[in-house]
């Protein structure tokens, strides 16, 4: 092969390669519009324009794929549909539904893996049409909260740094405004921080923080003077007084409960106290006739001149102590009485 033929062959190979590359990257070179979606919700994607929908009757095959990037050569098949077979999808990925009447793809519950570039191919007898879109999912923002980072007070004026914070949300944008103001406040670099210099004329000023992303927005209002004014110590005193008042009520209730408990215990003690018995005092008295004190022989027991008298006397018994209960006892008294001689 001469040099001229070899050069012609090289030109043909280059042209064939360029043609193949242009065909392979045709979808990636399309202008794919971005469609925002709310994460976790049901989404419906319109995969074709009105002009393409009108030519759907001429199509014989529909293919929908998804790729992580527009230039990615590997795509995941989502829907494969042959129109002559009655419109029933030959293949349908789990979590999707395809509506043939308007060429829309429905995602039942969107997740992060559903993000990406969706391509739809309409094959006709002698032509092929392409359509694409980019699905971008965002988490819905939560209600913001305004916090006071720091504040200083001097000569009746107050300088304060506010921070607007959210717990959830993707690509969050912060904006500040005054509730009764016309122009929005412009923090540095559209930050979530806002620096304020307040005076007595700003007592009723209310500031609003708004957070937003492509699928949601929330706002929260705040009156900073309530945190900055010197009179802010008054509510603290009221809280202290309220706490003392409640503590006093609780103390009175506790004392009342203790008194009731003591009264109940005393009533039970009186109920079970045994019946008191009178003390019996036994007095032994001996009576003897007067006479000679000369010593006589011991008389027989039957002639004993002494007569013993037993007298039982009863006296009031003093109230004993509640505890312990003492058993009743007897006191014996011995007395000697001498009769004169007759």
Curated annotation (Swiss-Prot):
Sites bearing Phosphotyrosine, chain numbering: 284, 310, 334
Subcellular location: Cell membrane
Disulfide bonds: 158-228, 164-209
UniProt entry tagged with the keyword Acetylation: no
Pfam family, one: SLAM
Superkingdom of origin: Eukaryota
Post-translational modification as stated in the protein's UniProt record: Phosphorylated on tyrosine residues by FYN.
Motif SH2-binding, residue numbers: 310-315
Motif (ITSM 2): 332-337
GO molecular function: identical protein binding; SH2 domain binding; signaling receptor activity; virus receptor activity
Signal peptide coordinates: 1-26
Main subcellular localisation: membrane
Residue span(s) of domain Ig-like V-type: 29-138
PANTHER family, alphabetized: SIGNALING LYMPHOCYTIC ACTIVATION MOLECULE (PTHR12080:SF49)
Entry's free-text remark on domains: The ITSMs (immunoreceptor tyrosine-based switch motifs) with the consensus sequence T-X-Y-X-X-[VI] present in SLAM family receptors have overlapping specificity for activating and inhibitory SH2 domain-containingbinding partners. Especially they mediate the interaction with the SH2 domain of SH2D1A and SH2D1B. A 'two-out-of-three-pronged' mechanism is proposed involving threonine (position -2), phosphorylated tyrosine (position 0) and valine/isoleucine (position +3).
The protein's name: Signaling lymphocytic activation molecule
Species of provenance: Canis lupus familiaris (Dog)
Lineage: Eukaryota, Metazoa, Chordata, Craniata, Vertebrata
